[in-house]
Amino acid sequence: MMASNVSRDVSQDQSSVVQTCKPWYAFATVAAGRFVRFASRVTKHGGSALPGKVVEKIDPGFLTRTLGQLPLGVVLVSGTNGKTTTTRMVASMLSDLGLKVFTNPTGSNFVRGVVSALLTEVTLGGKLDADIAVLELDEAYAVHFVKQVKPRYALLLNVMRDQLDRFGEIDTTAKLLSHVAAATTGTVVLNREDPRIAALAAKAPAGTTVRYFGLADDLRRYFPSDDDMATTVSVEGAAGPLPSARTPLSPRSELRGASAGTAELPADVTLTAVGDHKATFQMDGQGYATDVKLEGVYNLYNAAAALAVVRAVAADAQAMFLPFEDALADSVDADGADTGTETDGNGSHDAIDQAAADEILRAAGVSPRMIAFAHATTQAMIDTAGEVTPAFGRGEVITVNGTPVELLLVKNPMGFRLSLASFKPEGCDTMICINDEYADGRDMSWLWDVDFTSLRGTGVKAVSGVRAWDMALRLEYDQVPVESVSTDLEESVVDFVNANSGTPKHIYCTYTAMLKTRAALAKIADVADAGVGK
């Protein structure tokens, strides 16, 4: 009876994935997709999304059917800034806590990219060996994803001005994310400090839990929302720069902005202090300090977001499996001899023979690793958060002939501003690479909303990319000296990193410029494979 109850609980948790009929030819779906992937690599045509496109065409229910196998469902991560790093954190933390996690590689944050990623993980028969999926989705593609798969968890980070040629005004982006909140069946985790995101609580369906992550009052001024940015920039010169993850905070004048109206919402995880690769989080009324490997103060807030959604998953796992363990303990206490187990004499099930418990769990169709995850402590979650390293291009450090080269992705005014504030130019050489391909956004007018005056003292060694001359003009208006300008990105990157050997380098780059920068560096140094995880 206990086994059947647990089995029923697990099947109910899988109901967040829309059910579809399996076509008779589904046995060939994975093989066909892998053949297309192989052919596209050999011919160097089609890109990484082509296998997903083909699979969507021949077997539209593949995505829904495959993710429907996951006992803990899907975590969907979306928002303007921080998706990749936060997805990496959530996936790494859940994995370190014992779960088997499927996640989409960096850059595959659209539906076909997820399908393509699945092709590398499933068996030829379509079996996905994982407990949970953690998926980064672009705001626009997330809308299409939730029509096929209703996520059990949604983590919505922020809404900033980003690629307005794609989305229009930021209210349009918020509307896109509202569809995600409305489709979530278990828990929606929202950024309390972003008014547009916090407002999405109203879109969560009945029965869906809403949790928030937030900031302590004295940190809120350092993480302005898009609506706060004009106010923040207007006082920045007088108040001083933002803190970095490398530099302890110092007091500065009070800023009151649009996020003040949401400050009273209860936060499940609150970032209360940051310092030199350190952060303190408050959960359940208790503070937890940890060292962090991530760079940039903004990534410490991403860590708060990741902790909030991991806590939500753990709470559900506890609700699913711990009552079963208690029931098992009661049966053992009633008749330990008949079950072949022992109690500790105090009515506790701590001494239950693990082999017997595992046998019952396997009979119920529950993975023992999920039971172990249900026992994860808050301190264990904090410890795993501190071990996550930067995602590629997001504070990633590549060593070239002994010189550290740090890649910093920038794609909108707020992200660029926070990066400039977090990574001080003194003692480093700076390069900026700007492209305007589709993945970057065609409209580069947002560069004029970034304050580059912090670079006046050191100047910029090199500017490159398709829009190098636009960037150079923008720097000239802020009276920032520029040594060289070239649209030949690969040559410029190599020249830049080889100059002034031993001097640390910072390269600020848009998305496609970052990919090309990594490719250029891979020819002269060891560059890790792109992906999510450690």
Q: Where are the model-predicted features located?
A:
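Structural beta-sheet core signal
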Residues: 135, 154-156, 190, 212, ...
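A generic structural signal for short, well-ordered alpha-helical segments in conserved domains
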Residues: 87-92, 307, 472, 518
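Acidic, Mg2+-coordinating active-site environments of NTP-dependent enzymes
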Residues: 156-399
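Short, polar loop motifs at secondary-structure junctions
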Residues: 139-141, 192-196, 215, 466-469, ...
